[in-house]
Amino acid sequence: MEYNAGKKEINLDRNLSSLDELVLKFIRIIEKHSDYVIISGYVSILLGRSRATEDVDLFIENISFEKFVDLYEELKKNGFWCLNAEKAEEIYSFLKDGMAVRFSVENKPIPNFEVKFPKREIDKETFNDSVLVSLSKAKAKLKISSLERQIAFNRYYLKS
């Protein structure tokens, strides 16, 4: 792993896990419709920590209902479903009300993607200081929250 703090980039040259491949499939759809930042536990897994997870948390920008419908239709077309609701109006309403919604591969609730709009100013800032992770073997990139933000979140919010 190489970290360039000035460029806010990490280069990973490792084989992908099945979770990594699923994340890439999901994110390739998300990034066509919205900016995003992966946050929380999967970040440490991506960077080499060996632990299990049931979900991958991410913020997406606060997009319009029309853009969300396009995103949701593409997710469904690619085999994902929403665990919270089926109708786009309902799912979007959850997001607008500050709640997270979960998507997974159809009929496989785990692992899933917990998607949310940023609520607080500190959530919105994750987009400004995100780090780009290059997965060289997959020729792909993922945006994660900054390492400093990850540490602060774990220490002060989760108390771990």
PLM feature spans:
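Compositionally biased terminal segments of proteins
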Residues: 1-160
